[in-house]
Amino acid sequence: MKKRWNSVFKLVLMVTAILGLSLYVTTSQGVEVRAESITQPTAINVIFPDPALANAIKIAAGKSNVTDTVTQADLDGITTLSAFGTGVTTIEGVQYLNNLIGLELKDNQITDLTPLKNLTKITELELSGNPLKNVSAIAGLQSIKTLDLTSTQITDVTPLAGLSNLQVLYLDLNQITNISPLAGLTNLQYLSIGNAQVSDLTPLANLSKLTTLKADDNKISDISPLASLPNLIEVHLKNNQISDVSPLANTSNLFIVTLTNQTITNQPVFYQNNLVVPNVVKGPSGAPIAPATISDNGTYASPNLTWNLTSFINNVSYTFNQSVTFKNTTVPFSGTVTQPLTEAYTAVFDVDGKQTSVTVGANELIKEPTAPTKEGYTFTGWYDAKTGGTKWDFATDKMPAEDITLYAQFTINSYTATFDIDGKLTTQKVTYQSLLEEPVAPTKDGYTFTGWYDAKTGGTKWDFATGKMPAGNITLYAQFTKNDNPNPDDPTTNTPTGNGDGTSNPSNSGGNTTLPTAGDENTMLPIFIGVFLLGTATLILRKTIKVK
């Protein structure tokens, strides 16, 4: 029985090894695994429940009716599929088209691209005009070379970051603001991103194969990232916010450029009767381009525009319209520059009568000044009154349409006065510039108290009638002078009572005790020696008895 089980065990091990080896060989040789497949002939409209898509499959498979059955081999024979503007709402079933290379689904009502996620052979994908909003399902389709996502309601192009073989990309008519995920698409040759919300072209700076950029109707103001693109042939930039076209001056292959109808809005400046504004419009050489028209009777003397205004207005403006020449082409460059004006008001900062001021536009935040300092006080904030009033919040409170004064307010500080009597400490809390309360004069045997000083020895005596608390903690030290005779009223103090020869006088001792004379200090020595000898003899005697 035991041998039988051993044989079975060996057989199982052998089968497992063979299966494992087969799996390794299969995977190592790169055999393609189908994403999904049907196992038996099935009606087209069962596999593809959307009627419009089923009809497109019928045509692609060469069938006469959507109820006809197809096999997986039939589906594998479909390499391109078109369902243009037919009202497709779902692409369920497309996951079985394992050899699909080209897919056109323009102008439908598709919202979910999940069935596409494993169709890795697709090279051309046309999805424009669908309310997709999210295209994360195509993030892994690295074979795609042409992708059209025009008017698909997408805002995030992050799923496109890994499509490294992408050569042609349409992103027009979407609310896209950030194109940073495109920075790694180094094979990109054609990019169309018109009518979006793009303002920064920096992610394109390293796309050296880019030949065509269509970016009309955006919010682009800086085109300097395009200066590093040597193969750029065609650039469309009309209806943007571009004021300086000099970055394109040295682009040697540039033949087609559109730069008309730029709308430039400068940062607001304060209104002045005599307003001077620099001209921001620059041509290919970097030199200013003279205005074509100037509002409000303004004048131009390069590089500045000047207006003499009699009263406040919200803005002034000027237009430009001039042909500019690049290496291979001359094109019109036109637009309008608007200079917003802010009516200026004065915010005065008052620190105990000393004033500074800043000019601030109405409804703008006031920049908080450096907190003032005042000896003996703590700054509590800026208020709209000298005392009381409301504290100004520089994070939220905005300048009214009038001049204002803000007052620095302070609270007086309290400090600690420490009284030190030979290391024994007591304290008082005293407000700045107030008088200290004089403690009770301390006493010390044999000494006379002389006062409180600002040092342990020496120093300056504190005058409690006039000395005021400084802006800091202080320590005052009790100082004393030693008395010459600690008890001058006692005639017996320090009076000797002996006979004059070093011996005591019994009659003056007040008792019968005899005090030792000068030679009696060693009278205990004989007693000690006697006790020692007695103890030694006793010890010797005890040892002698034990021996016997």
Swiss-Prot record:
**Which gene does this sequence derive from?**
inlH
In the induction comment, the record states:
More prevalent in stationary than exponential phase (at protein level). Single gene transcripts are substantially decreased in a sigB mutant, induced in mouse gut. Induced as cells approach stationary phase and by growth at pH 5.5, at 45 degrees Celsius, in 7.5% NaCl and by oxidative stress (at protein level).
Protein location? Secreted, Cell wall; Secreted
The domain comment in this protein's record states: The N-terminus (36-79) resembles a truncated EF hand, the LRR region (80-262) has a curved form while residues 263-343 form an Ig-like region.
Residue positions of motif LPXTG sorting signal: 515-519
Which residue numbers fall in the propeptide? 519-548
Instruction: Give the originating organism.
Output: Listeria monocytogenes serovar 1/2a (strain ATCC BAA-679 / EGD-e)
Q: Which NCBIfam families does the record associate with it?
A: internalin_H, List_Bact_rpt, LPXTG_anchor
Q: Which residues carry this modification: Pentaglycyl murein peptidoglycan amidated alanine?
A: A518
The name under which this protein is listed is Internalin H
